[in-house]
């Protein structure tokens, strides 16, 4: 049947699918870069840490001092203020510094996990959760120049993010005792907003809230959700 169809029509029909494939491959490469840079920055920071500080962390990790948990709030807030005045990924001519800025909050969270309980298991669950959430964040940034196309093409990662947020929300609701009341409430509120946002993307193909840029809004949700996820992972992986 192929010889009956004109070649130009065949190419025109195939090109949109190739463009979509190229977009998702590009997003996958950026996600892989982000995860690799995150783990590398965390491990490098741990190895370069002065011995007295490392001994102090190892000595205090059983007590789980609150100061270590609160460290994961510092860099995300700083990056957020920087990105509030800066361009998004799709408009930034030099994308490497901005991508590294996206990695910093996750690198600090990884480092917090290492400081509290150094173990390779910290990377496994966090990387799996990161893959689902970061696809939404980076996909929206990459396709932010065309909001309509962005929302349509983000259907699959939005479903993955919705499943991830639903599981986290159910875990939070069933938790016997909040690990930290303020963080527990913030994470639960963020998950609720994430659920509303993902349902809006999937059902209505409209963004929520409309006044926020897609990349900035998803970055805020991403950072807040990551903070809660890492703390939950720490409790789940090393609970007695």
Curated annotation (Swiss-Prot):
Keyword check for Membrane: yes
Tree of life domain: Viruses
Main location group: host cell
GO cellular component terms, A-Z: host cell membrane; membrane
Membrane-traversing stretches: 29-49, 64-84, 96-116, 123-143, 153-173, 176-196, 218-238
Membrane topology: Multi-pass membrane protein
Entry annotated with the keyword Transmembrane helix: yes
UniProt subcellular location: Host membrane
Family, per entry: Belongs to the cytomegalovirus US12 family.
Protein name (database record): Transmembrane protein US19
Gene, per the UniProt record: US19
């Amino acid at each position: 049947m192929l010889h009956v169809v004109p070649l130009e029509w065949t190419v025109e029909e195939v090109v949109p699918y190739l463009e979509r494939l190229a977009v998702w491959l590009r997003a996958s490469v950026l996600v892989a870069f982000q995860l690799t840079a995150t783990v590398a920055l965390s491990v490098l920071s741990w190895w370069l840490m002065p011995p007295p500080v490392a001994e102090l962390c190892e000595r205090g990790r059983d007590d789980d001092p609150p100061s270590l948990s609160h460290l994961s709030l510092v860099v995300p807030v700083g990056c957020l203020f920087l990105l509030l005045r800066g361009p998004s990924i799709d408009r930034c001519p030099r994308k490497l510094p901005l991508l590294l800025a996206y990695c910093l909050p996750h690198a600090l969270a990884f480092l917090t996990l290492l400081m509290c309980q150094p173990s390779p298991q910290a990377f496994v669950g966090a990387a799996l959760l990161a893959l689902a959430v970061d696809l939404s964040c980076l996909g929206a940034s990459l396709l932010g120049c065309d909001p309509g196309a962005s929302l349509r093409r983000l259907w699959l990662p939005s479903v993955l993010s919705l499943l991830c947020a639903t599981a986290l929300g159910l875990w939070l609701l069933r938790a016997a005792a909040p690990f930290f009341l303020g963080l527990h409430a913030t994470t639960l509120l963020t998950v609720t907003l994430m659920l509303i946002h993902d349902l809006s993307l999937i059902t209505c193909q409209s963004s929520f809230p409309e006044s926020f840029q897609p990349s900035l809004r998803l970055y805020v949700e991403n950072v807040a959700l990551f903070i809660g996820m890492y703390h939950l992972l720490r409790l789940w992986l090393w609970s007695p």
